[in-house]
Amino acid sequence: MPRGSRSAASRPASRPAAPSAHPPAHPPPSAAAPAPAPSGQPGLMAQMATTAAGVAVGSAVGHVMGSALTGAFSGGSSEPSQPAVQQAPTPAAPQPLQMGPCAYEIRQFLDCSTTQSDLSLCEGFSEALKQCKYYHGLSSLP
């Protein structure tokens, strides 16, 4: 006896449905999908600018740390150290003007971090950038 309350004999045998005299109606052609509502997330340009700022900061910190470690392990010499000649990277294509809520702060911080050998001098620009990102909802402060 089956476990359920119905027995197998009480179910009618299913038959395939007879073909309909009318063909099934085709669904109406769909209109263009509605544009998604803005989600409050930063746009592509803002994300690219933030990523570029992070890359530049990481590069600057890496260069400072690398030169500090190299200087510490290379031993002292009586000659003053020669500053490394920095070449500005040549962009393959002209970069569009960065637009975004914190573009000015990003530019100021990047300019400072690329021209100063001591990144502690750029701390004010870093704080201004953090405040701008927080104010515009692009990040949360720790």
Curated annotation (Swiss-Prot):
Gene Ontology biological process terms in this record: maintenance of protein location in nucleus; maintenance of synapse structure; mitochondria-nucleus signaling pathway; mitochondrial nucleoid organization; mitochondrion organization; oxidative phosphorylation; positive regulation of cristae formation; positive regulation of mitochondrial outer membrane permeabilization involved in apoptotic signaling pathway
Subcellular localization:
Mitochondrion intermembrane space
Provide the free-text tissue specificity comment from this protein's UniProt record. Answer: Ubiquitously expressed. Higher expression is observed in heart and liver.
Q: Where is this motif: Cx9C motif 1?
A: 102-112
Species, as recorded: Homo sapiens (Human)
Q: InterPro entries recorded for this chain?
A: CHCH (IPR010625), CHCHD2/10-like (IPR055304)
Q: Which disease is it linked to?
A: Frontotemporal dementia and/or amyotrophic lateral sclerosis 2: A neurodegenerative disorder characterized by frontotemporal dementia and/or amyotrophic lateral sclerosis in affected individuals. There is high intrafamilial variation. Frontotemporal dementia is characterized by frontal and temporal lobe atrophy associated with neuronal loss, gliosis, and dementia. Patients exhibit progressive changes in social, behavioral, and/or language function.
What ranges does the record give for the region Disordered, renumbered to this chain? 1-45, 68-97
Q: Where is this motif: Cx9C motif 2?
A: 122-132
Q: Where is the composition biased (Pro residues)?
A: 21-39
Specify residue ranges for compositional bias: Low complexity.
1-20, 80-90
What name does UniProt use for this protein?
Coiled-coil-helix-coiled-coil-helix domain-containing protein 10, mitochondrial
